[in-house]
Regions:
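Formylglycine-dependent sulfatase
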Residues: 1-229
Length: 229
């Protein structure tokens, strides 16, 4: 986190001789872009039509046609380590996520407790004035901290995300998920016979983007959309 700036005003014995420091809201660079980061669970990049695979993905293809495709990269092929590396920009062992949270132990690099000094991209953008959100699978909270009683320091809302809606652990039913809205447990499938988690996540993300656009049109947003398998 940023250090608290020194007081730049003046404090005199009397109010009339004192000068308050001007408080400024975080500002973003002019024309800062909105950012949508999509993370898909348990899928290889070669599955998509964009890379010659059998799964038709016209949306991704449209993005690729107007952007870049990469085919050389490193992945851990595991949930928590990949997510930790993606969100912090650091090698997964250096942020204590050598394995999934369910197999955490006390050896260095494996306790599944991302240190405070390893800021997430959401925290950096949040401090820079962005609105931030996470929809979907998190799987970065130590397993003993995943209950509704917290602590919430390593939940999305404690790691730079203003808004969280999804599942906190490794997996959940797509039809009857044990989900969370911020840190409150919910059962979104109740009285909804056609409920499906991925569709719900997409609707929630779109609604959040629309609310943000209307209420804070001058602030860009960062949305981390991470569907579970």
């Amino acid at each position: 986190p940023k250090a608290t700036p020194p007081f730049s005003g003046r404090i005199d014995r009397l109010l009339e001789g004192s000068e308050a420091r001007r408080l400024e809201a975080p500002s973003v660079p002019e024309k800062a872009p909105n950012i949508l980061l999509v993370m898909l669970d348990d899928v290889g990049f070669g599955s998509f039509s964009s890379f010659g695979g059998p799964v038709e993905s016209p949306g991704f293809q449209s993005v690729a046609n107007n952007g870049l495709l990469y085919n050389q990269f490193h992945t851990t092929a595991l949930c928590s380590p990949t997510r930790a590396a993606l969100l912090t920009g650091r090698q997964h062992h250096s942020v204590h996520m050598g394995g999934i949270t369910e197999i955490a132990n006390s050896f260095p690099g494996y306790d599944s407790q991302i240190p405070a000094e390893a800021a997430t991209v959401a925290q950096i953008l949040q401090m820079s004035g962005y609105g931030t959100s996470c929809f979907g699978k998190w799987h970065l909270t130590p397993s003993w901290e995943q209950g509704p009683a917290g602590p919430y320091d390593r939940w999305p809302t404690g790691m730079g995300f203003d808004r969280f809606y999804g599942i906190i652990g490794a997996e959940a039913s797509h039809w009857e998920p044990a989900a969370y809205d911020q840190t409150t447990p919910i059962s979104p499938h109740i009285n909804r016979p056609d409920y499906h988690l991925t569709e719900d996540l997409a609707d929630q993300a779109i609604n959040w983007m629309e609310r943000h656009r209307v209420s804070a049109p001058d602030r860009p947003w960062f949305c981390y959309f991470s569907t579970p398998a």
